[in-house]
Amino acid sequence: MQDVTLPAMILLGTLGAASLMVWGLIGSRIRQGGPVISGTTLPLPRVHWISAVLVLSWVTMQLMVLASAPSSDGVKVPDLVDVQALCLFSGVLFLALLIPLVSQEQPETSGFGFDLRDWRRQAWLGVLGFLGCVVPVIAAWSTTLPWRTPTSQHGLLQLLEHDDSLLSLAWIVLAAVVLAPLLEELMYRVILQTWLQRIAPPREALLAVAVVFAAVHRLPDAVPLFPLALILGYLYQQTRSFLTVVVTHMLFNATNLALAVM
């Protein structure tokens, strides 16, 4: 394990304290008998079959690749061209998933959470969601320390260690902080969780998506990402806000990137 720098310790300490405050508020709401977040009254929309097939195919392919890969293999370090290609692919896939959902054949578009009329509240809930995930994620991450090596960390973080130029950093920010949250929240929360919730109880749908989301990120990262996925799933289930879960995910990825830079 690398030495933790003073700026990183300050950032983690500040976020940890804020996270404990959020959990204190959550505990207070639970003791009062109220919901942590009031549930949405929006009807559950139907997921367009094209979007559902694309997501199920992608997830199946990812899980098959992980299952066939030797557990001892380290994470492949991409180069800048790989990151640029990843950004292009992510943007194209995002549009391919989004367009069927908002097409004229889908009258229930608002139920997917794309309504921004109350964007300030949605964004603030995303910030609170991020703060709420800090302590559980750190606790889960600490259990994986014996299995962590320099080659097991995310490929983009390894690239940053080899090439810390502003150009590389800009592309990594675009890939990890902007495009990855947009695409993954559309895939896992908006499409997969909504689709599952129409055929299974809400709690089981949330749990299943959280397991899949964590699994596709492979070990050891899957362990700390599981509580993050549970929180993201709960946020989306209660608010049905795409902006809320994207803000939470963006802040999480941005924090990981900032810690790597520090």
Question: Model-found features: residue ranges?
Answer:
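Interfacial helix-capping/hinge residues at the ends of transmembrane alpha-helices
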Residues: 109, 189, 193, 229-233
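N-terminal, membrane-interfacial amphipathic/helix-forming hydrophobic leader that caps
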Residues: 1-111, 116, 121, 254-262
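Juxtamembrane helix-loop-helix connectors linking adjacent transmembrane helices
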Residues: 65-89, 99-180, 198
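Functionally important transmembrane alpha-helices
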Residues: 203-262
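Membrane-interface helix/loop boundary segments of multi-pass membrane proteins
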Residues: 118-125, 183-207, 237-241
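Membrane-embedded alpha-helical segments of multi-pass membrane proteins
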Residues: 88-93, 174, 223-227, 231
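Aromatic-anchored segments of alpha-helical transmembrane domains
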Residues: 55-66, 133-138, 210-218, 251-258
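Active-site His/Glu-centered metal-binding helix of metallohydrolases
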Residues: 182-187, 191-192, 219, 251-255
